[in-house]
Amino acid sequence: MTKNYSARFVSRLTRDTLALILAGGRGSRLKNLTAWRAKPAVPIGGKFRIIDFPLSNCVNSGVRRICVLTQYKAHSLVRHIQQGWGFMRGYLGEFVELMPASQRIEDSWYAGTADAVYQNLDIVRSHNPEYVLILAGDHVYKMDYGDMLAYHVEREADMTVGCIHVPLKEAKAFGVMSVDENFRVTEFTEKPEHPQPSPGRSDETLASMGIYVFNAAFLYEQLIKNADAFNSSHDFGKDIIPSILRSHYRVIAFPFSDVQGGDPGYWRDVGTVDAFWNANLELIGVSPELNLYDEDWPIWTYQAQLPPAKFIFDNEDRRGMAVDSMVSGGCIIAGAWIGHSLLFSNVWVQSHTEVASSVILPDVKIGKHCHIRKAILDKGCNVPDGTVIGEDLEEDKRRFYVTEEGVVLVTPEMLGQKYRYIR
């Protein structure tokens, strides 16, 4: 049965919840894409940043008290939140509050995900929540957290973990769990070397989405206990959850499904360059799994004031056009051909250039007579006339970063250009 979210209201349950978004991660597997920005600040989908997805899920779910915990190279992330997320109504108790690493308790930065929350425990307590919703700030998905909160209360859980089945070959990157017939978690291993398949699924296993609901008092107790633990890495997946299970507390798994019905939901980690490229180009499809045009579950973001995209020249030898593509505001396609690509804002492509199967981030300038295929161009790249990318991977490896799947990542530094943009 399809849910009608147009009449969604803020329930007492969501009002009693404080969301903490962990947004301090570096995302080192994204290579040079995170050299100057935190992973949650990485642009995605033509006009968004990754952090917009958990933030939008909170707002759409009715969870309007939100804290964002930052650490690694947070300037562009902080600026994005300040510019795009100032619409919350403070007089109604709504807010998006930034919590930078600031050595509040000890002379050290956040040592792990649990330590990040522990170091801000006084602020969390000051908001007096009944429940605490802890979210990873670096995943792309749509989810109604109200459903998960109701599930948590109905099952009388101390902690609830959002979960999804992932391919066994990818499970090393996640926390993997086992559950009984009532979805009570019986085992949890963070990033196992040899993950085991779920019963009845030979090529999949049940993985944590990095989404947790805690009874607030229970969370405080566990964080204080873990802070004094010897040789702890102070991480929810590595330390907190296994410790809770050893003490036989009630930890329940919440199977993730699509916000529009009961189908398995869209959820992407976009933790590698290949995954990032795939996730962006999936959006071009006729009916992509992630529908950015869904008016019932909008993804909110900072809206730059830009003119419409412009396609110029219609001569036989040069025609500005894009097919099977998404082109954002401020772009000028001047006698160039764009195919199966995603262009972010303010991208200029000059005459006789071809761009195919590529993701072009904001403020990129591409010269004349260029051929670019299966590439990611980072923000601010200025591609000289006649440049060829993606046709000779051995040559590309000498200048750029090339993935196992043959995606070529290009940054301004790789092109010999000075850093000019806040990314």
Swiss-Prot record:
Molecular function in Gene Ontology: ATP binding; glucose-1-phosphate adenylyltransferase activity
GO BP annotations, alphabetical order: glycogen biosynthetic process
Pfam families linked to this entry: Hexapep_GlmU, NTP_transferase
Enzyme Commission number(s) of this protein: 2.7.7.27
Keyword Glycoprotein: no
UniProt key word Repressor: no
Binding residue positions for alpha-D-glucose 1-phosphate: 110, 175, 190-191, 208
Annotated pathway: Glycan biosynthesis; glycogen biosynthesis
The entry's keywords: ATP-binding, Carbohydrate metabolism, Glycogen biosynthesis, Glycogen metabolism, Nucleotide-binding, Nucleotidyltransferase, Transferase
Catalytic activity entry: alpha-D-glucose 1-phosphate + ATP + H(+) = ADP-alpha-D-glucose + diphosphate
Function: Involved in the biosynthesis of ADP-glucose, a building block required for the elongation reactions to produce glycogen. Catalyzes the reaction between ATP and alpha-D-glucose 1-phosphate (G1P) to produce pyrophosphate and ADP-Glc.
Subunit structure: Homotetramer.
Family: Belongs to the bacterial/plant glucose-1-phosphate adenylyltransferase family.
Record-linked PANTHER family: GLUCOSE-1-PHOSPHATE ADENYLYLTRANSFERASE, GLUCOSE-1-PHOSPHATE ADENYLYLTRANSFERASE-RELATED
Name of this protein: Glucose-1-phosphate adenylyltransferase
Organism: Nitrosococcus oceani (strain ATCC 19707 / BCRC 17464 / JCM 30415 / NCIMB 11848 / C-107)
